[in-house]
UniProtKB/Swiss-Prot annotation:
Molecular function per GO: ATP binding; carbohydrate binding; protein serine kinase activity; protein serine/threonine kinase activity
Span of domain Protein kinase: 368-642
Its membrane topology: Single-pass type I membrane protein
Record keyword Glycoprotein present: yes
Extracellular side: 23-311
Protein name per its UniProtKB record: Probable L-type lectin-domain containing receptor kinase VI.1
Length: 693
C-alpha cells in the first residue's frame, strides 16, 4: 500500500513538471514576430507611451524626445511588451533576432552648446523612473548605474564628451551600454563611402540621420549602421559589428523597446524621431525600410521667445556687421592661402596612397610625444604609433621648412605609394597638415640591419647567423631588381646601405627610406644637379657627374654585400676601403679569411665565396662592367656561373684620392644634399656621414 502511494506521488509530481515545462515551452514558442512601422507618429500615438519632456507633436507629426530646456529627460516606448527570448532546436533559450530602423534629427540650442544625446533602449519597463538628465541620458541615475538588476541594454548617441570625466573618450560618438552608461564599445561617428573611406559627420548637424540596428540571435552579433539620409547609398560596412553575448544576461522574456533622451545644464538640444520600424523573432526579421519622401518633414530651428522689434533690429544689424567681417576675413585668409600655397591639393594627393587624418596620427603617437621617437634624420623625425584600426605604425614627420624635405616627401609618395614587393617597406599612407608632411609605414619590429650587425652588446648575445645573412642579401637583391626592372618605371634608390634595410619578425629584408628615390621613364637620361648618397657606398662616377643610375645602386649593393659578409664598415679607417681589402685577399687566394670572425666556422664556405666575388663584381670602378641586379640574383641563386673579375677592376691610388676628396668636398659644401638618412623604423641612433652609416 505504501509503495503504491509513493508511486502515485512520484507520478503526480512528474506530471506537474511536464505540465510546467510544457507551459514554459508553449509560452516561449508563442514568441511570434513582433513588427510595427511608424511613418510619423500622430496617427499611432496610442501605440507610444511618452513621459517627461517627450511628446508627439500634432503640428509636424514628429516624436519629440526632449525640447531645448535645460536638465530635462524624456522617454518614448512602444506600449506593448515584446517577447525577445525563444527556444532553440536544442531546447535552449536564446535572445531572439531583432531589427530596427529609425530616422532622427538633433537641433542644438546653439552651435557648440548642444547636449546630451539619446538612446535606443531595451528596457524591462515602458519608462525609466528615477532616471537623471545630462550624462545619464534619461536612462539611469548615479545610484543604479552599473547595477546588474537594471536589465537595460542601450545604443547611445552621445553628443557631449565624457561620462564621469572621461569614460567616454569623446563627444559625437556611438556606444553600446549594458546596465551602465560607460560604453563597453564606442566608435566616433563616421560612415564608409563607396570606396571604403571613412567620412565623419555630426549628430547635431540638424540634418536627418538614418540608423539601422540588426541583432542575429544565432551568432549573437549586433550591427549598427548610421549615415545622413542625404546619401544616395547605404554603406556596405556597419560602424559597429560586435558579438554581444552580454545580452543573454540582460534580456528578460518580455522587454519594452523605445528611446530615452536628456539635456544638461548650459548644454541642451531638441531630439526628434521622424519615423521608426521594428521587427523581432521569426526567421531573419527585418525592419521595414523608411522611405524619406514618405516621412514628415524634418524640424526647423525656431525662436518662440517673442523678442521685441528693437532687439530684432539690433540682432539683424549685428548679424550684418558680423557677416561682412567674416566675408572680409574669409577673403583675407583665402588670399594668404593662395600666396603661401599652403595645403593646396596636388596631383599626387589624388592619385596615390590613402590619406590619414592628422588627428588619428596625433593620438596614435601620443601627441607626438618625445618618448615615442624611434629615429631621426632623413629630413625628419620618426615616431612609433598605434592605430586602433591597423595596429603598430611608424610615422615619419618631415621637416616642413626644407624645400629638400618637400621634394623628398613627393618622391616617397611617387615611388613607395605605388610599389608593392615583399622586400620593400610598405607605405600605408600619408598626411599633409598645414606645414607638416607625414608618411605612415608598417612598423618593423627588428629595426635596421646595421643594428643587428654592429650593436654592442649584440642583441641578446646572438650573432646574425650565416644562413640569415645570405637570405638577407638575396632579399635586398630581389627588392632592387623589382625597382630597376620589374616595375612600370625605373626607380633608382640612390642610398642603399644597412640603416635603410629593415628586418621583420621573420628576418626578411625590406628595403626602405625612398626619400632620395627618383623615377625615370625607361630610355630617358637622368637629370640630377646635386650629389646624394652616403660616403662609402657612393659609386665613383657620382663624384664626377652626380648622375645616379641603376649601376650606382649596384655599386652600393656590392659594398653592402661585402659589409654583411665581413662584418666591417666600408671606411673604418683613414686609408681603409672594404672593397680594396677584400680584393687583396681574393688576389692572394685567401678570400674566406675576410668572413666575419664572429661567425667562427659556422658558415657555408661556397656561399660565402660566391657572395664575396659577386660583391666585388658589383664594386667595379667602371659602371659598364657591373652586373645588373637580375644577373646578381642569378649568380646568388646558382643559376649562372660567376665570371672572372676584370683586371681593371680597382682604383689607382690617385683616382682613389680624387674620389675621396671629391666626395668630402661635396659633403662639406652642401650638407643638405647628403643623405645621412635614418631608417623610418629603426630604434638605433643615426650614424655620422663620415663613417658611412
Amino acid at each position: 500500500m505504501g509503495i503504491a502511494r509513493s508511486i502515485n506521488s512520484f507520478m503526480f509530481f512528474f506530471f506537474l513538471m511536464i505540465l510546467s515545462n510544457a507551459s514554459k515551452s508553449s509560452v516561449l514558442a508563442e514568441a511570434t514576430t513582433a513588427k510595427f512601422t511608424f511613418i510619423g507618429f500622430k496617427e499611432n500615438q496610442t501605440d507610444i507611451q511618452t513621459e517627461g519632456a517627450s511628446t508627439i507633436q500634432h503640428d509636424n507629426d514628429l516624436l519629440r524626445l526632449t525640447n531645448r530646456k535645460q536638465n530635462v529627460t524624456g522617454t518614448a516606448f512602444y506600449r506593448k511588451p515584446i517577447r525577445l527570448r525563444e527556444l532553440t532546436n536544442s531546447s535552449d533559450i536564446k535572445v531572439c533576432s531583432f531589427s530596427t530602423s529609425f530616422v532622427f534629427v538633433i537641433l542644438p540650442s546653439s552651435p557648440g552648446n548642444g547636449g546630451f544625446g539619446f538612446t535606443f533602449t531595451l528596457s524591462p519597463t515602458p519608462n525609466r523612473p528615477g532616471a537623471e538628465s545630462a550624462q545619464y541620458l534619461g536612462l539611469l541615475n548615479r545610484t543604479n548605474n552599473g547595477n546588474p538588476s537594471n536589465h537595460v541594454f542601450a545604443v547611445e548617441f552621445d553628443t557631449v564628451q565624457g561620462f564621469k570625466d572621461g569614460a567616454d573618450r569623446r563627444g559625437n560618438h556611438i556606444g553600446l551600454n549594458f546596465n551602465n552608461l560607460s560604453s563597453n564599445v564606442q566608435e566616433p561617428l563616421i560612415y564608409y563611402d563607396t570606396e571604403d573611406r571613412k567620412e565623419d559627420f555630426q549628430l547635431e548637424s540638424g540634418e536627418p540621420i538614418r540608423v539601422l540596428i540588426d541583432y542575429d540571435g544565432s551568432s549573437e552579433t549586433l550591427n549598427v549602421t548610421i549615415y545622413p539620409t542625404r546619401l544616395e547609398f547605404k554603406p556596405k560596412k556597419p560602424l559597429i559589428s560586435r558579438r554581444v553575448s552580454e545580452l543573454s544576461e540582460i534580456v528578460k522574456d518580455e522587454m519594452y523597446v523605445g528611446f530615452t533622451a536628456a539635456t544638461g545644464k548650459d548644454q541642451s538640444s531638441a531630439h526628434y524621431v521622424m519615423g521608426w520600424s521594428f521587427s523581432s523573432c521569426g526567421e531573419n526579421p527585418m525592419a521595414d525600410w523608411l522611405e524619406i519622401s514618405r516621412l514628415p518633414p524634418p524640424p526647423r530651428l525656431s525662436n518662440k521667445k517673442g523678442y521685441n522689434s528693437q532687439v530684432i533690429v539690433l540682432i539683424v544689424a549685428l548679424s550684418i556687421v558680423t557677416l561682412v567681417l567674416l566675408v572680409l576675413l574669409f577673403i583675407f585668409v583665402m588670399y594668404k592661402r593662395r600666396i603661401q600655397e599652403e595645403d593646396t591639393l596636388e596631383d599626387w594627393e589624388i592619385d596615390y596612397p590613402h590619406r590619414f587624418r592628422y588627428r588619428d596620427l596625433y593620438l596614435a603617437t601620443k601627441k607626438f610625444k618625445e618618448s615615442e621617437i624611434i629615429g631621426t634624420g632623413g629630413f625628419g623625425i620618426v615616431y612609433r604609433g598605434n592605430l586602433s584600426s591597423s595596429g603598430p605604425i611608424a610615422v615619419k614627420k618631415i621637416t616642413s621648412n626644407s624645400l629638400q624635405g618637400v621634394r623628398e616627401f613627393m618622391a616617397e609618395i611617387e615611388s613607395l605609394g605605388r610599389l608593392g614587393h615583399k622586400n620593400l617597406v610598405n607605405l600605408q599612407g600619408w598626411c599633409k597638415h598645414k606645414n607638416e608632411l607625414l608618411l605612415i609605414y608598417d612598423y618593423i619590429p627588428n629595426g635596421s640591419l646595421d643594428s643587428l650587425l654592429y650593436q654592442t652588446p649584440r642583441r641578446n648575445g646572438i650573432v646574425l647567423p650565416w644562413d640569415v645573412r645570405f637570405e638577407i642579401i638575396k632579399g635586398i637583391a630581389s627588392g632592387l631588381l623589382y625597382l630597376h626592372e620589374e616595375w612600370e618605371q625605373i626607380v633608382v634608390h640612390r642610398d642603399v646601405k644597412p640603416s635603410n634595410v629593415l628586418i621583420d619578425e621573420d628576418m626578411n629584408a625590406k628595403l626602405g627610406d625612398f626619400g632620395l628615390a627618383r623615377l625615370y621613364e625607361r630610355g630617358t637620361l637622368t637629370q640630377t644637379t646635386k650629389i646624394v648618397g652616403t660616403l662609402g657606398y657612393m659609386a665613383p662616377e657620382l663624384t664626377r657627374n652626380g648622375k645616379g643610375s641603376t649601376a650606382s645602386d649596384v655599386f652600393a649593393f656590392g659594398v653592402l654585400l661585402l659589409e654583411i659578409v665581413c662584418g666591417n664598415k666600408p671606411t673604418n679607417a683613414e686609408n681603409f676601403f672594404l672593397a680594396d681589402w677584400v680584393m687583396e685577399f681574393h688576389t692572394n687566394g685567401g678570400i674566406l679569411c675576410v668572413v666575419d670572425q664572429n661567425l667562427g666556422s659556422s658558415f657555408n664556405g661556397r656561399e660565402a665565396k660566391l657572395a664575396l666575388v659577386v660583391g666585388l663584381l658589383c664594386c667595379h670602378q667602371k659602371p659598364k662592367f657591373r652586373p645588373s641586379m637580375r644577373m646578381v640574383l642569378r649568380y646568388l641563386n646558382g643559376e649562372e656561373n660567376v665570371p672572372q673579375i676584370d683586371e681593371n677592376w680597382g682604383f689607382s691610388d690617385s683616382s682613389r684620392d680624387d674620389h675621396k676628396s671629391n666626395v668630402v668636398g661635396y659633403v662639406s659644401s652642401d650638407r643638405a644634399s647628403s643623405s645621412n638618412t635614418f631608417s623610418s623604423f629603426s630604434n638605433v641612433s643615426s650614424s655620422s656621414i663620415v663613417s658611412g652609416r
